[in-house]
């Protein structure tokens, strides 16, 4: 018998719910988790436990959080933590001169780190989709020029890691 995909709250995904919606929720959750780790100093295991038991698929402070694809969420968060020393210089190079990653708001650092990780390691997701999804995530937190910066940085990184996708048109 095929194993049913589980959401981040370990409940089966509703039949009408699309994989893309669960992945989008996982991306948003990953960015929130990375932000919390960055500003609050929380550890990976604590973050996983908190998000899996209290946030996703639940109502928190009046907001209903969507179920998320647990494996995808964990992959992005743990991958960014593992590869951050490699990802940060890539993002720094893609940022405009005079704007090192350390000067960028913590939530945008989390967005760009997650996007850069996914571009490098999640070849199952087209690069343009990754960039678009993380621009959408950024839009949940900031407006205007900041989302343009996220788009430009991730597009540059995408062309570095996935040049073949862009050469095909």
Curated annotation (Swiss-Prot):
Outline what the protein does: Involved in transcription antitermination. Required for transcription of ribosomal RNA (rRNA) genes. Binds specifically to the boxA antiterminator sequence of the ribosomal RNA (rrn) operons.
Quick one: where's region Disordered? 1-22
Family named by the database record:
Belongs to the NusB family.
Compositional bias of kind Basic and acidic residues? 1-19
Endpoints of the signal sequence? none
Entry GO MF terms: RNA binding
- The entry's keywords: RNA-binding, Transcription, Transcription antitermination, Transcription regulation
What's an example GO cellular component term for this entry?
Answer: cytosol
Pfam families associated with the record? NusB
The uppermost taxa in this organism's lineage are: Bacteria, Pseudomonadati, Pseudomonadota, Alphaproteobacteria, Hyphomicrobiales
Q: Which NCBIfam families match?
A: nusB (TIGR01951)
What's the name of the protein?
Answer: Transcription antitermination protein NusB
């Amino acid at each position: 018998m095929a194993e049913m995909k589980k959401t981040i709250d370990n409940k089966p995904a509703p039949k009408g719910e699309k994989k893309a919606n669960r992945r989008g929720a996982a991306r948003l959750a990953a960015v929130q988790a990375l932000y919390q780790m960055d500003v609050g100093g929380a550890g990976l295991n604590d973050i996983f436990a908190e998000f899996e038991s209290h946030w996703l698929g639940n109502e928190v402070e009046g907001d209903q959080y969507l179920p998320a694809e647990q494996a995808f969420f964990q992959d992005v968060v743990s991958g960014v933590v593992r590869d951050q020393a490699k990802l940060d210089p890539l993002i720094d190079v893609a940022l405009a001169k005079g704007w090192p990653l350390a000067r960028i708001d913590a939530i945008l650092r989390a967005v760009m780190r997650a996007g850069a990780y996914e571009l490098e390691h999640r070849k199952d997701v087209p690069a343009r989709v990754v960039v678009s999804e993380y621009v959408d995530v950024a839009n949940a937190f900031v407006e205007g020029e900041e989302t343009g910066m996220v788009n430009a940085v991730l597009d540059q990184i995408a062309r570095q890691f996935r040049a073949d996708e862009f050469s095909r048109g």
